[in-house]
Every structure is written in structure tokens, then in C-alpha cells.
């Protein structure tokens, strides 16, 4: 990684989280001159027996990106593969079972901690001579002048770039400074996350039960424990947080129908508010948005981070093609190719997740009957089920 003395870059990435570091790694491998701006220094000094409460279901497509930049090997020891997924409805007998063996594949994906991914990516980026990491650094303002974005940092430093990328999350300062409006709506729900130990092993299976108040997921971890994500109406989520550990474990086991036996113990619990949000535009002259800066979806299908990594792959491919054709990587016509490729896909996933939330949150009898019938029909249709699995795996 270069010492951050140069002030003129091909690409400046605001945001050194998972998505921003992934983009920096891909572009750095292709010898673009890149600066990554991150507001806080990451703390990767954690006890080895601790588990990050933020975990992601990493698809095969996202895994391929990590392998391509050389980061996967550092993640692998704490990656939990899952070959099966079981989904069922609390309001009836609807049940569906996905099994990677039906596709001749060893697994559907991996569950990985956020900090494990970020640490591996940071180690890759640190070895790339064309990438500079500025930390702490925060964008104060930027202005388009000629063929550069001129970026002023809060500490007074100035940078210039052919392209500024906002990878700075759902409250993106880059998006705000660019005047790009984001439409947001609150789901009225919160996701309660924790790490739990169960009586029976998770068997490398991801589990999800649709409750009237929101979905409950058990995700397998590398050490035999499970990460749980319980999306619930805000009042219920707060009541669950107020329970002591024993009562919470009992409530969790009951809500999960004891599919893995008793819940024996749990870690600390945290709440994250749920909302959906999408930027009206992904690009402007010499500016692009990726990841949560451009779209936030319900975690129901665990696709949020994978959508962000699809953004990374598409934007990197767009910039590489432009460079190969000797075109300006910051030109709006070039960047609109990226927007066309990703905006429709992200919006489609958002509306699908909204539809699932409405469908499985309904207690209206005809809808309950229809969704249970639908789950069972899909489970009995191998061709359709295999198509769903391939799409979810990113194949």
C-alpha cells in the first residue's frame, strides 16, 4: 500500500468498509491509482473465541470475487459452509428444503463475520502499491472542476480524482453532497441479533421460520454455534431485549420450534432498525454510488451485502472496459452503463423482499393458505427449486 502523499488519483473511494475495500482490491489489482477514505481505524484485535454479531451469508459469486483478489484464504478458517436451507411458515404447513447436492454442488454459500471479511480485504489492500489508505479521513466537500472531482477532507487535505465513489453506507455523505435524493421508508421493525449455542448441531444448514411478526433465521457458524437474526415489530423486539438470558433463550427456542433442541446460551444482543432505501440515481459526472449508499433492502434473504458486491464487480468491469478502450472512466456515459446494469436488479430485489414481507406477515386466511400452498408446490418442483437455488448462489 502506498504512502498517501500523492493527491491525484484515478479513483477515490469514500468508505473503507467491506464494499469499499472490495472495490479498492479489485481496482488496485488492475493497477488503478486508488485512495480509500475511512473515518475510523478498524480494531481487529479480538479474542479468537468471540464472534462478531454482524455476519453475512456470502454467495458463491461473492466468494469468487474474494478469491479473485486473493482474500478468500484468510477468511476460510472462519467461514461456515452451508449445504442446505430449510424454510417454513409458522402459519401453516408450508415447508421448503433447498439442498446443494440436488445441483451437484458442495454448498449453497458461507456464513462469515463482517470483521473477518474486512480484515482479509485490508490485508490484501495493504500489499497493493497503487492503493493508498487515508484513515482517519472524512469528506468535507467536493467540487467538479474540469476533468476531476476536487475533494476537500475535514482535516484540510485536498485530493483530486477522475472518479469519486461513495461506498459510505446508508447515510452516505457523498450522496448527500452530490444532491442525490434517497427515498427511504421504515419497516417498523428491528432485527435482533445474537450468537447462540443449541442442544443439537446446526448440521451446516441455514434455517428460517416465517413468523407473523417477522422472519427468524438461524445461521451456522464455523465453531458449531449459530448466529440468529430475529426480525420483529419494534415493540416485540424491545420486549425481547428486556428479557434475561434464560427467558430469552426459552422464547427463542419456542419461536424456532426447537428444531435444534434447546437454546442453551446466548451472547449479548443488539438491535438494528430495519428500513428500505434507494437512491434515485447511482451516478453523476465523475461520481458513482455502491452498496448501501445506493440501496438498502430487508435482510429477509440475506442479500444486502451480496448486492453491494455485485455493484463492485459491475463498476470495476465498467471502469476496466473504459480504460481498455481509452475512454474517460469518469464520463457520465461510461458510468451510466454501470447504473443500467445494477439499478434494475437492486430495485427488483427490494420489491421482492417487500412482497415477501407483506405476504408472510399477513394473517388473512386466504393469504396464509396461498403462501403455504406456494411453498409446498415449489418444494415439489425440482426444476423451479433448482433455478431459485442457482439465482441465490449467484451462479
Predicted features and spans:
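Central beta-strand plus flanking loop segment that forms part of the substrate or channel wall
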Residues: 61, 171-206, 222-226, 233-236, ...
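Short FAD-binding loop at a beta-strand-to-alpha-helix junction that anchors the flavin cofactor
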Residues: 283-299
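Conserved FAD/dinucleotide-binding core of flavoprotein oxidoreductases
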Residues: 211-273
Amino acid at each position: 500500500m502506498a504512502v498517501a502523499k500523492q493527491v491525484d488519483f484515478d479513483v477515490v473511494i469514500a468508505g473503507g468498509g467491506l464494499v469499499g475495500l472490495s472495490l479498492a482490491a479489485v481496482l488496485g489489482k488492475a493497477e488503478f491509482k486508488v485512495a480509500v477514505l475511512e473515518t475510523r481505524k478498524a480494531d481487529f484485535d479480538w479474542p479468537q473465541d468471540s464472534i462478531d454479531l454482524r455476519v453475512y451469508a456470502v454467495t458463491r459469486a461473492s466468494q469468487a470475487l474474494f478469491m479473485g483478489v486473493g482474500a478468500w484464504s484468510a477468511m476460510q478458517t472462519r467461514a461456515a459452509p452451508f449445504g442446505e436451507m430449510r424454510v417454513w411458515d409458522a402459519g401453516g404447513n408450508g415447508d421448503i428444503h433447498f439442498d446443494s447436492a440436488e445441483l451437484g454442488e458442495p454448498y449453497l454459500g458461507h456464513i462469515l463475520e463482517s470483521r473477518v471479511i474486512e480484515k482479509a480485504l485490508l490485508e490484501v489492500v495493504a500489499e497493493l502499491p497503487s492503493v493508498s489508505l487515508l484513515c482517519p479521513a472524512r469528506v468535507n466537500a467536493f467540487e467538479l472542476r474540469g476533468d476531476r472531482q476536487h475533494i476537500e477532507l475535514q482535516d484540510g487535505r485536498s485530493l483530486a480524482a477522475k472518479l469519486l465513489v461513495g461506498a459510505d453506507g446508508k447515510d452516505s455523505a457523498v450522496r448527500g453532497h452530490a444532491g442525490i435524493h434517497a427515498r427511504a421508508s421504515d419497516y417498523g421493525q428491528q432485527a435482533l441479533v445474537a450468537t447462540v449455542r443449541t442442544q443439537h448441531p446446526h448440521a451446516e444448514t441455514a434455517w428460517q421460520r416465517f413468523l407473523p411478526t417477522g422472519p427468524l433465521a438461524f445461521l451456522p457458524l464455523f465453531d458449531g454455534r449459530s448466529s440468529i437474526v430475529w426480525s420483529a415489530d419494534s415493540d416485540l423486539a424491545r420486549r425481547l431485549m428486556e428479557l434475561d438470558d434464560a427467558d430469552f433463550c426459552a422464547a427463542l427456542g419456542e419461536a424456532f420450534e426447537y428444531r435444534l433442541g434447546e437454546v442453551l446460551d446466548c451472547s449479548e444482543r443488539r438491535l438494528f432498525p430495519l428500513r428500505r432505501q434507494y437512491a434515485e440515481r447511482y451516478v453523476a459526472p465523475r461520481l458513482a454510488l455502491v452498496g448501501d449508499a445506493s440501496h438498502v433492502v430487508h435482510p429477509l434473504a440475506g442479500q444486502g451485502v451480496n448486492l453491494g458486491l455485485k455493484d463492485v464487480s459491475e463498476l470495476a468491469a465498467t471502469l476496466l472496459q473504459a480504460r481498455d478502450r481509452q475512454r474517460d472512466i469518469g464520463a457520465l456515459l461510461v458510468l451510466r452503463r454501470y447504473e443500467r446494469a445494477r439499478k434494475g436488479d437492486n430495485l427488483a430485489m427490494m420489491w421482492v423482499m417487500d412482497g415477501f414481507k407483506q405476504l408472510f406477515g399477513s394473517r388473512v386466511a386466504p393469504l396464509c393458505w396461498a403462501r403455504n400452498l406456494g411453498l409446498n408446490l415449489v418444494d415439489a418442483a425440482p426444476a423451479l427449486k433448482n433455478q431459485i437455488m442457482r439465482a441465490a448462489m449467484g451462479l
